[in-house]
């Protein structure tokens, strides 16, 4: 393993076991940077939840407000992870094998830090409409104790969770079981 300089001593390159991986230059690389409001690979849309609980997009994050880790696997496929100051994953971006664009998966949190939406690549390409959110998004709801009580999967399948007084999950039921 090789490590980046600096006080955090973060790994920058790792090889699989055996000399063949090293001789072939087949390593897993990591580089560390910040987001940018001008460079396409480093743009990150700023999704949020409005006062009515609806998913909205507030443009892009300002430059240098998010940490970005750039990964390159043994086959030279590149992916990016964008994290906020609370180290929450906001965006997982994978470069297409043809290097002609990206597939983005966004993670949207509420004001107390609960994951509320997962926006897969199909939705980030389709745009935010009620129909596209219903069709493609993962949507999570929580109770006052921050327990997930409802999960909606792409296509509208709903899973409900019931907890006992000791906060243990007692039952989960999807919409097929409810019928």
Where are the language model's segments positioned?
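Beta-strand elements of repeat-based all-beta scaffolds
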Residues: 1-179
């Amino acid at each position: 393993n090789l490590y980046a300089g600096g006080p955090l001593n973060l790994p920058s390159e790792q090889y699989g076991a055996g000399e063949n991986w090293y001789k072939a230059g087949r390593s897993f690389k990591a580089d560390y940077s910040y987001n940018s409001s001008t460079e396409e690979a480093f743009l990150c849309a700023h999704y949020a939840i409005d006062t009515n609980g609806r998913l909205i997009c507030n443009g892009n994050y300002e430059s240098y407000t998010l940490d970005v880790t750039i990964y390159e696997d043994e086959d030279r496929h590149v992916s990016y992870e964008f994290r906020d100051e609370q180290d929450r994953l906001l965006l997982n971006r994978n470069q297409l094998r043809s290097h002609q664009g990206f597939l983005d998966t966004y993670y949207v949190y509420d004001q107390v830090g609960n994951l509320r939406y997962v926006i897969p690549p199909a939705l980030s390409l389709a745009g935010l409409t009620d129909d596209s959110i219903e069709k493609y998004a993962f949507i999570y709801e929580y109770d006052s104790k921050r327990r997930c009580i409802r999960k909606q999967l792409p296509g509208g399948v709903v899973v409900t969770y019931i907890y006992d007084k000791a906060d243990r999950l007692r039952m989960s039921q999807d919409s097929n079981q409810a019928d």
